[in-house]
Regions:
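Eukaryotic small-GTPase/lipid signaling interfaces
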Residues: 1-174
Length: 174
């Protein structure tokens, strides 16, 4: 019955979710291979968020119209929700931070009706920068490690000693 409502857009979302999940696993693999040396991790995570914001706000170097901005927003929102539902929390948190970035929040365009609800669900599940995403870290400790990919963004806040990461994200508009 639900097959008649399936579209190429759904296939694209699924493809991107799978690719992002592989990327998350690659980041974990690289950390493991480097003996958990995380000195470059904050730069990599910041670059991921910044590049996602750039992708959201661009249309193949052409002038961005609201129509394309809305399409990009809707697409990344769907990828975030699907990643969240499939326990790829690195991707979900990165997209959440991109979608709620001040560069995106400040733009005047119509968001999808259910966008705020999806963002609120993710935000409430993870906690805030001010709480160092303690809800996510607490949840991570209780989950099955085989299927659950925790967010390195949240985890790295507990590794950095002087809350430099929290300060940087606040300065970036979060």
């Amino acid at each position: 019955l639900f097959g008649c409502f399936h579209s190429p857009w759904d296939d694209r979302v699924e493809q991107v979710v799978k690719a992002c999940r592989l990327s998350t696993k690659s980041i974990y693999g690289e950390l493991w291979a480097n003996g958990m040396d995380i000195k470059d991790l904050p730069k990599m995570l910041d670059a991921g968020i910044t590049n996602t914001v750039k992708l959201l706000l661009t249309n193949d170097r052409k002038k961005m119209k609201k129509k394309y901005l809305m399409q990009n927003y809707r697409f990344f929102l769907a990828v975030m929700k699907s990643s969240f539902d499939s326990n790829d929390h690195q991707t979900a948190m990165m997209l959440y931070m991109a979608l709620t970035h001040m560069s995106v929040e400040g733009l005047d365009f119509k968001r999808p009706k259910k966008a705020q609800g999806k963002l609120d669900t993710v935000g409430k599940t993870y906690g805030s920068v001010e709480s160092c995403y303690n809800k996510h870290v607490t949840e991570m400790l209780r989950e099955n490690v085989n299927d659950y990919l925790p967010s390195l963004i949240a985890c790295s806040m507990y590794v950095n000693k002087h809350d430099a990461y929290a300060k940087a994200f606040k300065n970036m508009g979060h």
